[in-house]
């Protein structure tokens, strides 16, 4: 019985504890003027991504993925939207190399679909054309 307990303690554990939207913002610095005039050029969409990992304890880690979408037309910013989606993960029993892979690849892959949905919803609420973030391979 004691051996079984010891084996269970040594088994690697990986579990998503919580997934949440940590931050969201949208700015439309040139509204309503951008809606009133005919655009001379096609809007340009710029997307930026960032992954951040923070140890909350020896076994719990927060992994956050942030995306910033900037839409410009005629040299004017039409919209800037930013969403930061995070997850709290229980991770224990892995070696250092595995921990790096889990933090940089596995966890962001779990959190990212929620970020995509929240960004699409946020942009849609501005009445701008929908912006759908691309699928992402964190490998």
Residue locations for each model-derived region?
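N-terminal intrinsically disordered, cationic/polar leader segments
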Residues: 1-110, 114-139
């Amino acid at each position: 019985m004691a051996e079984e307990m010891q084996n269970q303690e040594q088994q690697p554990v990986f579990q998503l504890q919580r997934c949440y939207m940590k931050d969201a913002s949208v700015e439309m610095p040139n509204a309503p003027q951008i809606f009133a005039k005919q655009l001379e050029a096609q809007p340009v969409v710029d997307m930026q991504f960032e992954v951040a990992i923070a140890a909350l304890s020896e076994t719990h880690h927060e992994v956050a993925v942030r995306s910033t979408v900037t839409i410009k037309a005629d040299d004017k910013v039409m919209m800037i939207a930013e969403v930061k989606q995070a997850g709290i993960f229980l991770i224990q029993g892995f070696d250092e190399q595995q921990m790096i892979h889990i933090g940089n690849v596995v966890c962001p892959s779990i959190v990212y679909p929620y970020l995509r949905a929240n960004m699409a919803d946020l942009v849609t609420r501005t009445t701008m054309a929908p912006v759908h973030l691309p699928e992402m391979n964190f490998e």
